[in-house]
C-alpha cells in the first residue's frame, strides 16, 4: 500500500500537535514507530485513508462504533441536531428520553446524569462515592484504564496491602496514596488489601469485564467476592462500563453477570459516535449530586442535543433483534480461523473472546490479569499489526487492545480477515 499522503499528514501534524496525535494511543510508538494512517472517511465496517486505501475496521474507535461508521439512522439524527441547534445550555426533551432508555436497559441506575466522556463519568462517580460514604480511598485493579484524571493514573505499590505510586508525571504522591491497586482475578490479594484498608475505602472501581488489557472475563466467584466484601466493609462498588455497556448485549455487562453495582459509569457506545459520558446508580447515592446534594458536577456541553439524539438513535439501532447474536457468530468464525492459522504456521498465541470482541496475545500463558497480558510479545505484535495493515485490516496499535466487531461486519469480511491473518502468521513463523 502507498501511504505517502498519510506520512505527509503526520509530518505536518508534528509541527502543530503534540506528538502529532491527540491521544497517545493513536501513535505507532507501541508497534515499532512510523506514521499513523490518516483516515478520511468511514462507512459500515470500513474506512478509507487519505491515500485511498480501504481497510476492514476492527479498531471501531476503541469500541464506540458498534453500529459501524456512518449508520444512516444515526446520521439522520445528527443531521437533525445540526439543523436545529447543537447546544442550548437548557434542559431538553432529548436528555429525558435518553436517560429513561438507559435506565430501562441498566436497571441498577435509578437516576442518571450526563457529561462528556468516560473519563468525566468515572471521575464523578468517585467524587459521589466519597461524598456518600465520607471516605477518601478507592481501590482499583492493575491494568484497568479508567481515564486520564490524576486519581486513576496510579500504579500498584510493592504488594497488595501497600499504597499506590504515581503512574504519570504530574500525579502527586499524596494523590497516589489515596489509591489501592490490586491484581484482577486475584481473590487472595483483594482480600488482603480489603482487610488492611477496607474501612477507609469509599469505593471499589472495576471493569466487570476487562477491555483495557484485552478482553478478560472475571473468574467464577471473583466479582461476587468483590461485592460481598464491599458490602461488609461499607464501600461502594463502581462498575466502569465505558467499554462494556451495549457492546456485548443490549444493556450493561452487569446484566449478563447478574450483579448490581452501586454506581455505573458509561461512555463510548452510548454516544453513537459523538462525545458523551453518563453515570447513574441508586437514588439515595445519586441524590448527593448537585443541585440536590453537596457533590458538585457540571458541564457546558453535558446533555447537549446532538449527543443525546445520536445516543437515542444508536440505542434504537441496537434494539434490532438478533444483531448481538450475529456479532457473536461472526466472532466465533474469526476466533476459529485465527486459531487454525496459528496452529498451521506454528505461531504461539492465546486468544480471549467474548461475543463480538477478542484479543490475540503472543504468549503461551492464559491471560486472566494484567501481569499475564504483559507477557504478550510486543515486538511480534508490532510486526503482525503492520502486516495486517498492509493487507487492509486495521487494528489498534497496541498489544493490549481488543478487536471489535460491529453490526456491519459480514461473513465475507471475516473470511478476508482470516486470509490476512494466515499470511501475517506465515511471515512471523
Curated annotation (Swiss-Prot):
Taxonomic placement: Bacteria, Bacillati, Bacillota, Bacilli, Bacillales
Signal peptide extent: none
Needed co-factor(s): pyridoxal 5'-phosphate
GO function term, MF aspect, one: pyridoxal phosphate binding
Pfam families cross-referenced by the UniProt entry: Aminotran_3 (PF00202)
Keyword terms of this UniProt record: Cytoplasm, Isomerase, Porphyrin biosynthesis, Pyridoxal phosphate
Name this protein carries in UniProt: Glutamate-1-semialdehyde 2,1-aminomutase 1
Pathway in which this enzyme or protein is active: Porphyrin-containing compound metabolism; protoporphyrin-IX biosynthesis; 5-aminolevulinate from L-glutamyl-tRNA(Glu): step 2/2
HAMAP family: HemL_aminotrans_3
InterPro entries, per database record: 4pyrrol_synth_GluAld_NH2Trfase, Aminotrans_3, PyrdxlP-dep_Trfase, PyrdxlP-dep_Trfase_major, PyrdxlP-dep_Trfase_small
Gene from which this protein is expressed: hemL1
Post-translational modification N6-(pyridoxal phosphate)lysine, affected residues: 268
Record flagged with keyword Cytoplasm: yes
Oligomer status and interactors: Homodimer.
Annotated NCBIfam families: hemL, PRK00062.1, PRK12389.1
Main location (coarse class): cytoplasm
PANTHER family: GLUTAMATE-1-SEMIALDEHYDE 2,1-AMINOMUTASE, GLUTAMATE-1-SEMIALDEHYDE 2,1-AMINOMUTASE 2
Cellular compartment(s): Cytoplasm
Keyword Cytoplasm appears in the UniProt entry: yes
Family: Belongs to the class-III pyridoxal-phosphate-dependent aminotransferase family. HemL subfamily.
SUPFAM superfamilies, A to Z: PLP-dependent transferases (SSF53383)
Top-level taxon in the UniProt lineage: Bacteria
GO BP term, example: protoporphyrinogen IX biosynthetic process
Reactions that this protein is recorded to catalyse: (S)-4-amino-5-oxopentanoate = 5-aminolevulinate
First-tier enzyme category under EC: isomerase
Amino acid at each position: 500500500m502507498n501511504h505517502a499522503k498519510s506520512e505527509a499528514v503526520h509530518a505536518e501534524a508534528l509541527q502543530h500537535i503534540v506528538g502529532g496525535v491527540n491521544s497517545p494511543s493513536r501513535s505507532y510508538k507501541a508497534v515499532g514507530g512510523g506514521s499513523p494512517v490518516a483516515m478520511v472517511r468511514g462507512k459500515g465496517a470500513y474506512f478509507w485513508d487519505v491515500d485511498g486505501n480501504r481497510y476492514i475496521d476492527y479498531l471501531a474507535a476503541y469500541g464506540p462504533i458498534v453500529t459501524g461508521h456512518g449508520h444512516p439512522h444515526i446520521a439522520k439524527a445528527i443531521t437533525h441536531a445540526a439543523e436545529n441547534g447543537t447546544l442550548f445550555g437548557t434542559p431538553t426533551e432529548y436528555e429525558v428520553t435518553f436517560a429513561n432508555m438507559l435506565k430501562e436497559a441498566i436497571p441498577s441506575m435509578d437516576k442518571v446524569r450526563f457529561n462528556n466522556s468516560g473519563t468525566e463519568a468515572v471521575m464523578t462517580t468517585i467524587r459521589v462515592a466519597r461524598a456518600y460514604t465520607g471516605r477518601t480511598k478507592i481501590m482499583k485493579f492493575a491494568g484497568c484504564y479508567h481515564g486520564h484524571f490524576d486519581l486513576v493514573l496510579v500504579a500498584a505499590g510493592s504488594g497488595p496491602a501497600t499504597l499506590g505510586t504515581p503512574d504519570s508525571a504530574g500525579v502527586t504522591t499524596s494523590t497516589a496514596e489515596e489509591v489501592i491497586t490490586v491484581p484482577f482475578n486475584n481473590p487472595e490479594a483483594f482480600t488482603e488489601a480489603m482487610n488492611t484498608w477496607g474501612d477507609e475505602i469509599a469505593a471499589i472501581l472495576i471493569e466487570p469485564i476487562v477491555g483495557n488489557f484485552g478482553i478478560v472475563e472475571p473468574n467464577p466467584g471473583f466479582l461476587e467476592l468483590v461485592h460481598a466484601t464491599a458490602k461488609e466493609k461499607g464501600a461502594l462498588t463502581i462498575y466502569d462500563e465505558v467499554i462494556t455497556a451495549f457492546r456485548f448485549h443490549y444493556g450493561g455487562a452487569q446484566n449478563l453477570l447478574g450483579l448490581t453495582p452501586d454506581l455505573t459509569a458509561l461512555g463510548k457506545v452510548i454516544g453513537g459516535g459523538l462525545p458523551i459520558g453518563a453515570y447513574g446508580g441508586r437514588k439515595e447515592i445519586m441524590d448527593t449530586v448537585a443541585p440536590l446534594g453537596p457533590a458538585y458536577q457540571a458541564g457546558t456541553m453535558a446533555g447537549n442535543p446532538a449527543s443525546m439524539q445520536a445516543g437515542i438513535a444508536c440505542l434504537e439501532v441496537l434494539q434490532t433483534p438478533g444483531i448481538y447474536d450475529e456479532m457473536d457468530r461472526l466472532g466465533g468464525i474469526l476466533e476459529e480461523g485465527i486459531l487454525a492459522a496459528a496452529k498451521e504456521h506454528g505461531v504461539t498465541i492465546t486468544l480471549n473472546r467474548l461475543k463480538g470482541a477478542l484479543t490475540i496475545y503472543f504468549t503461551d500463558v492464559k491471560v486472566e490479569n494484567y501481569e499475564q497480558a504483559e507477557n504478550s510479545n510486543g515486538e511480534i505484535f508490532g510486526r503482525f499489526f503492520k502486516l495486517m495493515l498492509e493487507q487492509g485490516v486495521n487494528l489498534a496499535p497496541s498489544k493490549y487492545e481488543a478487536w471489535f466487531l460491529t453490526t456491519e461486519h459480514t461473513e465475507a469480511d471475516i473470511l478476508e480477515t482470516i486470509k490476512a491473518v494466515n499470511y501475517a502468521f506465515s511471515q512471523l513463523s
